[in-house]
Every structure is written in C-alpha cells, then in structure tokens.
Amino acid sequence: MKKIVCLAIVLAVFANVNTFSASKKSSGKKSNTSSTQINSEAPQVALKFLKEYTEVLENNTTGIPNDVSNPEDYDVRYIYFKTTDLITERFRNELLKLTIECYSEEDGCGADLITGHQYYDPKLKILSYNSNKGIVVIQGVDMPDFKVKVKVKNVNGKWLVDNSGF
C-alpha cells in the first residue's frame, strides 16, 4: 500500500506541469529553438543542475546500505537537494519529502525523482528550450533516447529549476 501511495505522490508531482497542449501536432520539422536561446541562462541552469545531479549519482561511493533509517544524513541525493542553489524552495521541499518517502519503501520509488527514468546518461546536452513555457529538454549524448524535461523559473532575477522528470 505504501508503494502505491508513494507512486501516486511521485506521479502527482511530476504531472502537475502540463508541457504540451492536447492540440499540439507532431511534425517532422526541427525544433525552432535557436542557439541563442539554448545558450541563454535559463537552459544552462537546467543543464548544470542535471550534470551536477548525475555527477552526484556517479560519485556515490558511500557504501551506505538501503535500510538506513535516516536518509537525511546518508542519502547523496537528499544531501544534494538540500544544498544545491539551483532549485526553487518549492521544488527542494518536494524532493526532500519524496526522498524520505521513497527511502522508506522496500523497493524505493522505482523511477528516479529527477530524471523520471531508472537509468541516466552522465553526458548531457540541451535538446530544446521553450522560453514561453520555461521547459528545457535535456538529452543524453551517449544514450539519445534518454531525455528529461526540466521546468525553469525566474525567481528574483535568478533562473532556478522548479520541476524535472515530468
């Protein structure tokens, strides 16, 4: 039952941002994202956040078992979420809460809270950026099927990540 509740919470968090309207038609045209947009601060913040996060996962050498009762002290993801200055407070609080909830589950939450996948590519690039919606799509270099949508938001003149993996 806890797994179902945890999964429902994860899905609710990542489903709260509707990135594409139902009327959007698929076409074979290339994205109209310009290199100027991709090189702007907002998508670069999204890329930096995902690169830092995957680096944290890559360098996780703590050897701490999964049955530790206090992930706040040991879980590298929790520690990263708590200390990074690249995410909004709303997103930080949601991630910290979900990390603890997933940690208490026997099998965790399944998909990663940030990427929405069970795997990741540490080599990343910006695929597209919709400045109107604040949506950045990050793609794996070695695994092009690995794509993560990241929502960015300007808070007091600073671009921050406000959602990811939805």
Describe these PLM feature segments:
Residues 133-135, 147:
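Intrinsic-disorder/low-complexity, polar/charged segments enriched in Ser/Thr/Lys/Arg/Asp/Glu/Gln
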Residues 126-133, 152-158:
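A short, structured loop/turn motif at beta-sheet edges
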Residues 145-166:
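Short beta-strand edge/turn micro-motifs at domain boundaries
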